Amino acid sequence: MSSFDYIKTAIRQKGCTLQQVADASGMTKGYLSQLLNAKIKSPSAQKLEALHRFLGLEFPRMQKNIGVVFGKFYPLHTGHIYLIQRACSQVDELHIIMGYDETRDRQLFEDSAMSQQPTVPDRLRWLLQTFKYQKNIRIHAFNEEGMEPYPHGWDVWSNGIKAFMEEKGIAPNWIYTSEESDAPQFREHLGIETVLIDPKRTFMNISGAQIRENPFRYWDYIPTEVKPFFVRTV
């Protein structure tokens, strides 16, 4: 991602053409195009300020520490929450990207002891309710349909998630995970430094698979916002 991807995102969100943006910012369309593609080594501060002002962006832009957490959250559990809280405390902005795949998710349900299948809206609602008071957290849903499960699908998945993050204007400095085997893959395929949180499950010895297999045995690891989903099925 170039350093001006956030400007590309702002232009798309504003719904303007490059010519309209260039005219409003006092530059030619060619100059703007080169700027956005990092072809201009020392861009004019005056032009940059005008561009940011037109798009409603802060200038000069403060460098933020941005983190990302990937997961299915099928279902959300206290291990996820511990990971997210730790990550959230280390960055200015944290993006939670929830992956979903109708075929895979259906199979997870059929192989589980759950009485009903969590939907994508269910999983998003759990995240939104759990972190509603943390203003530096952003939550997204990413369609992984047709992407082969890792470890075989890293190339396809990484290309898909790169495009998704560029579209959303997400340029993370850090990835946070509890999965030791994922860390080198994130570094290799996404080129983003990865931080491991509680990989040995010392603080939260729980997994989504355990809860799917026996929700009531691991009841204490199911968050308050998620418990009503299971209670309804009794």
Regions found by a protein language model. Give the residues of each.
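Nucleotidyltransferase catalytic core that binds NTPs
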Residues: 60-234
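Helix-turn-helix/winged-helix DNA-binding modules
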Residues: 13, 40-43, 203
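A short, Lys/Arg-rich alpha-helix, primarily the initiator
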Residues: 1-16
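Short alpha-helical "recognition helix" segments of helix-turn-helix
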Residues: 20-22
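DNA major-groove recognition helix of helix-turn-helix/homeodomain DNA-binding modules
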Residues: 46-61
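Recognition helix of helix-turn-helix/homeodomain-like DNA-binding domains
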Residues: 26-42
